[in-house]
Amino acid sequence: MTNLTLDVNIIDFPSIPVAMLPHRCRPELLNYSVAKFIMWRKETGLSPVNQSQTFGVAWDDPATTAPEAFRFDICGSVSEPIPDNRYGVSNGELTGGRYAVARHVGELDDISHTIWGIIRHWLPASGEKMRKAPILFHYTNLAEGVTEQRLETNVYVPLA
C-alpha cells in the first residue's frame, strides 16, 4: 500500500444518476462483472469511461460476509436513462449526503487499509459517526496503460 498517512476531508456528495450493474456473488468473481460492465459501456456508449465517472458501491466487507451473500455494484455516471439490455445494467442513483473521503493510491487489493484507516482511526478521532449506507469508491484514473500501482481511488465513508 502506498498510503502512509490519510488526508481525510468531509464533503457533501451530490446524488448522481448512474448505470448500475449489481454483483451478487463471490468477491473472487467480481472481475467477471466488471468485464460485463465494460462490454456494456463499449457497446452502448451511454457511460463512456473517458467522459463519465466510474464508481463501486461496497455493501459488504468481503472479509466478513459469506461469499454467496456478497454485494457490490459497478456504476458509471450517465446523463440519460438506461434502456433494457442483455447485460443487466439498469438505472440507479448514488445517494448523496455527508461523506468522509480519502484518496487510495495503489492496487485495489490493498484498499481495505484505506477504508479501515478512516473507520478505525480517523472516525473516532474526528467525533463523527458513520451512517448506515454503503461505502463508495470513485475510480478517478481508469485508463489504458495505468498500472495497478498508480490507480487512484477516492474512498467515501458515509457520515451521519
From Swiss-Prot:
Highest taxon of the lineage: Bacteria
Pfam families assigned: GyrI-like (PF06445)
UniProt KW keywords: Repressor, Transcription, Transcription regulation
Electron transport is among the record's keywords: no
SUPFAM superfamilies membership: Probable bacterial effector-binding domain (SSF55136)
Record carries keyword Thylakoid: no
Function: Represses expression of mcbR.
The protein, known as: Probable transcriptional regulator YgiV
Gene designation per UniProt: ygiV
